[in-house]
Structure formats: structure tokens, C-alpha cells
């Protein structure tokens, strides 16, 4: 009887192992990454826009003016009320300044911000062994990716001053790294999708 149960346990283990599929092939991972993230455009906002600032805010004016010259922001002269301390008391006074907005006429601009590239897979670093968790089969893929098709406007600004843009410019040599969960469903692997979708950041 003991021998029977040993065989039953081994057989059950063998069936369970056999039921778990092989991990996704690198070609499938690349294809699924391109489908899931390759068309996902990357957007950047130098500040929360539209933004109204005084002319005397030289540092901010200098920062935003380079985006105006690059054609992705617009600048308009304006006057608005600002609180100033006068004679020891706060008062609202009319000041001269600028209003900065996204340049909707630019091909690089959308309501989401300023386009600065889109993801491309760089290297598949590791693929875990598939696991059955509560009747659902998952595996984890550790990969690196970079920002591709960087737009020309980046060459017209000091991109080193903005971390997101700096990382994008350097990402071919220093790629981003990400762990993504994959699920085996309906006989094939796919990027795991839940109520909160996986992101690259």
C-alpha cells in the first residue's frame, strides 16, 4: 500500500510538471514587448503647463525659452496680478510676464506632452521557470530597453538638465531595466494584464 501511494505521488508530480509549459521564447518576448510597449510613445513636460511667470524669474525664463526656440512651446507676453510685499504688507500688483504653453502646431506635441521617443527592447537578461499559481501559469522576464527614434528637438535644448531626457539620450549605452510578468493563457504566452496594467517606469 505504501508503495502504491509513492507511485501515485510521483505520478501526480510528473503530471503537474508536464502541465506547465516551456517559458516563452526570446522571439515571442520581443514580439509581445513590441505589441505591448513598442507603440507606447514617451512624453515629457518641462513644467506643469500652461504656466504664467514674471519676467524677472530669469532662471525659469531661460529654461523654458529653449523649448520655445526648439518649437515645442509657445510664449506670449502677459500681465497678471501677483502678491508683493509693499510697505511691510502683502499687496496684489500688476506685473509683466510670460505665458508658456504647449505648441499644438508642432508635430512633436500632443495633449500628453512633448514626444521624446518610444521603447525598443535591448536585451532579454533572464526568463524565470514558469510556475502554476492557483491554477494560472506565470513567469517573469527580466529585460533591458532603450528609447528609440529620438526627435530632433532634443538637439536644441540642454537635455542634460532633465533626468528623463538625459536617461533617454543615454539609454542605448545605459539601458533601462524592467521585470515584466507573463501569463500562459489559451495555449499561448502574453504579457500579464490586470486591473492595473504593467508599465515600464
Q: Which residue ranges define each predicted feature?
A:
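Short amphipathic alpha-helical interface segments
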Residues: 20-54, 58
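Hydrophobic h-region of N-terminal signal peptides that target proteins for export
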Residues: 10-18
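Mixed-charge, low-complexity intrinsically disordered segments
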Residues: 89-103, 149-173
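Short beta-strand edge/turn micro-motifs at domain boundaries
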Residues: 140-142, 147-148, 168-201
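Sec-dependent signal peptide recognition
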Residues: 2-10
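Extended amphipathic alpha-helical interaction segments
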Residues: 104-139, 148
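Basic amphipathic alpha-helical segments that dock to polyanions
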Residues: 57-75, 79-84
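Accessory beta->alpha helical hairpin/"wing" motif in late/C-terminal subdomains of nucleic-acid enzymes
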Residues: 74-116
